[in-house]
Design a protein with these regions (language model features):
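Signature of N-terminal electron-transfer/Fe-S-associated modules in redox systems
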Residues: 1-202
Length: 202
């Protein structure tokens, strides 16, 4: 794993919004009183959602106090897991899976589309500052490869042309429909084969 460093530019303060605070308290109460520090990952996610898709150091310190947990322990969690962004990303944060199943099915064509429409390099903001992209490891939708995640939504069964159209919509302020772009429902077969024993259509 590459070394992950927090952004050099950091806000001085952070605190949960009313909605985030309610969500955090709800999660913490699900743990025994002596195990509530186990909620740290969920609270980091809440902080990231509130703060435009990235977690500043001030948020880590705030969560440490919230959970009565040493700041360094929160920092260790946030810097270890790659789903936590340690520097500003776009409002539309695009993650392209390039693990083996997606790679075999053309994931790097999706990367080409991101380079053309957003920025030449990963983790760079688009010209209008609204989007950024990066390659990631498996997102768990291998059967619908290649795919990418935009914020909380999955876009599956893609190729370069379809990806370019999705990115054009995002850049123009539209919200593209998530899901399969081959018309599949969830992960149903692409042909008429419905069982492993249906050898005629294999």
């Amino acid at each position: 794993m590459s070394l992950r460093r927090p952004s050099k530019e950091q806000p001085e303060n952070f605190e949960f919004s009313t909605a985030s605070l309610t969500a955090a308290k709800t999660i913490v109460t699900k743990y025994p009183k002596d195990k509530q520090q186990s909620a740290v990952m969920a609270l980091l996610y809440i902080a990231q959602k509130q703060n435009n898709n990235w977690i500043p150091l001030a948020a880590m310190k705030y969560i440490g106090k919230f959970l009565d947990m040493p700041y360094i322990k929160v920092y260790e969690v946030a810097t270890f897991y790659t789903m936590y962004n340690l520097a500003p990303v776009g409002k539309h944060f695009i993650q392209v899976c390039t693990t083996t199943p997606c790679m075999i099915r053309g994931a790097y064509k999706l990367v080409e589309a991101c380079k053309e429409k957003i920025s030449e390099n990963e983790n760079e903001l688009s010209k209008d500052k609204s989007c950024s992209w990066m390659e990631v490891e498996c997102l768990g939708a291998c059967v619908n490869a290649p795919m990418m995640q935009i914020n909380d939504n999955y876009y599956e069964d893609l190729d370069k042309e379809k990806t370019l159209k999705i990115l054009d919509k995002i850049l123009s302020g539209e919200t593209p429909k998530p899901g399969s772009y081959r018309g599949r429902i969830n992960n149903e077969p692409e042909n008429t084969r419905k069982t492993l024993m249906d050898l005629k259509n294999a």
